UniProtKB/Swiss-Prot annotation:
InterPro entries (UniProt xref): Cellulose/chitin-bd_N (IPR004302), GlcNAc_Chitin_IntDeg (IPR051024), Ig_E-set (IPR014756)
Entry's Gene Ontology cellular component terms: host cell membrane; membrane; viral occlusion body
Protein name as catalogued: Spheroidin-like protein
Biological role stated in the UniProt entry: Component of the virus occlusion bodies, which are large proteinaceous structures (polyhedra), that protect the virus from the outside environment for extended periods until they are ingested by insect larvae.
Signal peptide: 1-19
Pfam families in the cross-refs: LPMO_10
Keywords: Disulfide bond, Glycoprotein, Host membrane, Late protein, Membrane, Signal, Viral occlusion body
Compartments where located: Host membrane
Glycosylation, residue list: 193, 293
PANTHER family membership: CHITIN-BINDING TYPE-4 DOMAIN-CONTAINING PROTEIN, GLCNAC-BINDING PROTEIN A
Positions of disulphide bridges: none
Subunit-level organization: Homodimer; disulfide-linked.
Presence of the UniProt keyword Membrane in the record: yes
Length: 302
C-alpha cells in the first residue's frame, strides 16, 4: 500500500520541482552542507569545506562507486543529498497518525535521511546525513549554570506551505551513544503541538516571509545531542518531512564571558535596526541574549 502511494506521489509531482521545507533554527544538517557549497567538483567531494559534510558526501559517493557506478553518476547521487535539503521526506499514507507505522515501516532506519538510502527510490539516497560522525557541527545553546531546561522557538522554514499539518519534536536521550546512528528508541519527545505559521521574525536562514514557529522546552544534555523534527501533512498521501539538527549546551560562565555575548547581541541588533534597545552594559546584554533564547538571533553554527 505504501509503495503504491509513493508511486502515485512520484507520478503526480514528477513534472515539477518538489520543495517543502527544512529546519532553520536550529539548522538541519543537510542545509548546513548545502550552504557550505563546493560539492560539485571534484566528483569525490574533496573540496567540501566541512569535515562531517565531506564525510557524508563521500559515504554515499563511494557506496555507489563500490557498486561499479561511474564517477559522475555516483557524484550526482551524493550531490542530490545536499541539493534536496528541503525534501527529506517519506510517505506514510492515510494512517500517518499511527506512530508504530512510522517507526516500523515509513522511517524504520536512516532517520536523519528520512529513511532514504537507495538512489533508485523516489527520494534518493540521503544516508550520509545519518552517519554517526563525531564532527557534526552543532548549534550552541547558551544557558545559565543553574538552568535545568532551555526554552526556545524552533523554526521550520517552508519552501512550500502545507496545511493542515502538525509537528513532533524529539531530542536524543541523555545516554545516547554518538558512535551509533539514531534510532527511535533513543529519542525523547519534547513537544510540537503548539506550532504556528507566523511572519518571519528575522530568521536569516529562511527566505520565506512565513516560518513555522514551534515552542519547546529542551532538557539539559551534558554532551552534544541531536534534535529530530517531524513535519507531517494531514492528507490521504501522508507525506512527512524529517530533519536532524546537532546541538550542544554551553554555560554563560564558561563560554559567554559577557563581553563576547554583548558584542554578538549589539551586532545582531544593529543589523535588524533595533539599536535603540541596546544596553551597552556587558552583563545586561549577555543576560538579554540568554533570555531571548536566540529565537530570532540564533547562532547557526556556520
Amino acid at each position: 500500500m505504501i509503495a503504491l502511494l509513493i508511486a502515485l506521489f512520484a507520478a503526480i509531482h514528477a513534472p515539477a520541482v518538489r520543495s517543502h521545507g527544512y529546519l532553520s533554527v536550529p539548522t538541519a544538517r543537510q542545509y548546513k552542507c548545502f550552504k557550505d557549497g563546493n560539492f560539485y567538483w571534484p566528483d569525490n567531494g574533496d573540496n567540501i569545506p566541512d569535515a562531517a559534510c565531506r564525510n557524508a558526501y563521500k559515504s554515499v559517493y563511494y557506496k555507489y562507486r563500490a557498486l561499479d557506478l561511474e564517477s559522475g553518476a555516483a557524484a550526482s547521487t551524493a550531490q542530490y543529498m545536499f541539493q534536496q535539503y528541503m525534501e527529506y521526506a517519506a510517505v506514510a499514507g492515510p494512517n500517518y497518525d499511527d506512530f508504530d507505522l512510522i517507526k516500523q515501516r515509513v522511517v524504520p532506519h536512516t532517520l536523519c535521511g528520512a529513511g532514504s538510502n537507495d538512489r533508485n527510490s523516489v527520494f534518493g539516497d540521503k544516508s550520509g546525513m545519518d552517519e554517526p560522525f563525531n564532527n557534526w557541527r552543532p548549534n550552541t545553546l547558551y544557558l545559565n549554570r543553574y538552568q535545568p531546561v532551555y526554552q526556545m522557538n524552533v523554526h521550520f522554514c517552508p519552501t512550500a506551505i502545507h496545511e493542515p499539518s502538525y509537528f513532533e519534536v524529539f531530542i536524543t536521550k541523555s545516554n545516547w551513544d554518538r558512535r551509533n546512528p539514531i534510532t527511535w528508541n533513543e529519542l525523547e519527545y519534547i513537544g510540537g503541538n503548539d506550532s504556528n505559521l507566523i511572519p518571519n521574525p528575522g530568521d536569516s536562514l529562511c527566505d520565506n516571509s512565513l516560518v513555522y514557529s514551534i515552542p519547546v522546552v529542551i532538557p539539559y544534555r551534558s554532551n552534544q545531542f541531536v534534535m529530530y523534527v517531524r513535519w507531517q501533512r494531514i492528507d490521504p498521501v501522508g507525506e512527512g518531512f524529517y530533519n536532524c539538527a546537532d546541538l550542544v549546551f554551553e554555560t554563560l560562565d564558561d563560554e559567554c564571558r559577557y563581553a563576547q555575548m554583548a558584542k554578538v547581541v549589539r551586532s545582531q541588533l544593529q543589523k535588524h535596526k533595533l539599536d535603540a534597545r541596546i544596553d551597552h552594559n556587558d552583563e545586561e546584554s549577555c543576560w538579554r541574549a540568554r533570555k531571548s533564547n536566540y529565537s530570532s538571533f540564533f547562532n547557526p553554527g556556520f
